[in-house]
Amino acid sequence: MKLERLLAMVVLLISKKQVQAAELAELFEVSVRTIYRDIETINRAGIPIVTSQGSGGGIGIMETYRLEREWLKEEELFAIASALQSVSSMYEPVSHSTAYQKIKHLIPEQSTQAFKHQTEKWFIDMTAWGHTEDQKTLREKISAAIDRLLTISFTYTSASGETLLRETEPYTLVCKAGHWYLYAYCLVRNDFRFFKLNRMKDLAILHQTFIRKDIQLDTLPWDKSWYQKDRLTELVILVQPSARQRIGEWFGYDVLHCCEEDEICQAVISLPEDQWLIGFLLQFGKDIEVLQPLHIRDKVKETIHHMQKIYET
């Protein structure tokens, strides 16, 4: 499209002092005559384009205009490019790739190596191990509904195993701790809710539009639906040396109270008391022991007993 070509041409001219018309024609796969017509269009838009003849000549933006256009420092461009790369590991629309290439073209030639070094300094991949294309397709489908302000329906299974058909007004896709969630207004509960994407099935985009309510994402307590203080239970556990690293990663090493490196440690941790809790504790196997509270200890023992009966048959 002409508009995209004009924008790309301006971005390219911002980063380079002079570009030959033939080079632009080859890059954008149009004729040299078309390039000169585009230059006239850009001039009429208020961006002063000049041409110069001879060796080293070509098409460029007027030097006096250069100071006005330098509104982003190189360090800021590096940061934007790194952020785009990180987002692309989780969500890959064409616009992100195009935006990255445009940012790349803004970097002066003398800073190309510095740009490469800075964008390779960090590599953030928030996708889950063994993630499937189904999850990516689901995210893109929800994103399309958000863009078009269309309600969606899906079958949702909660952590407790309850399955319901939900109809929602989708607001925001949230990636937290490697998992994707949808923040949406639930028309069944008449309130905002979080929905874990891997618990959704049979998602459909409906033809009913909605008016987006004003929300402030930066003030939303993303842990609120799970990590509420009134739902937390304080647990006292014994931790074998083999589990010390994993407990430290989850809760911080300051919760571990040990006398010697090879000794069993005691830890005091706080977690929501729900169906998830017992499964979380059992993942550590024989490497931890719940001391308190007694009702949680009994639930762990009961679950282990049921598991033993299953494997004995």
Curated annotation (Swiss-Prot):
Disulfide bond annotation, renumbered to this chain: none
Residues in the DNA-binding region annotation: 19-38
Keywords: Cytoplasm, DNA-binding, Repressor, Transcription, Transcription regulation
Domain HTH deoR-type: 2-57
Domain WYL: 131-210
Location(s), subcellular: Cytoplasm
InterPro entries referenced in this protein's UniProt entry, alphabetically: CBASS_pafABC_assoc_protein (IPR051534), DeoR_HTH (IPR001034), HTH_11 (IPR013196), PafC (IPR028349), WH-like_DNA-bd_sf (IPR036388), WH_DNA-bd_sf (IPR036390), WYL_dom (IPR026881)
GO molecular function: DNA binding; DNA-binding transcription factor activity
Main location per the UniProt record: cytoplasm
Gene Ontology cellular component terms for the protein in this record: cytoplasm
Cross-referenced SUPFAM superfamilies: Winged helix' DNA-binding domain
Highest taxon of source: Bacteria
PANTHER family referenced in this protein's UniProt entry, alphabetically: PTHR34580, WYL DOMAIN-CONTAINING PROTEIN (PTHR34580:SF8)
The name this protein goes by in its record: Uncharacterized HTH-type transcriptional regulator YobV
Organism: Bacillus subtilis (strain 168)
Upper classification of the organism: Bacteria, Bacillati, Bacillota, Bacilli, Bacillales
UniProt gene name: yobV
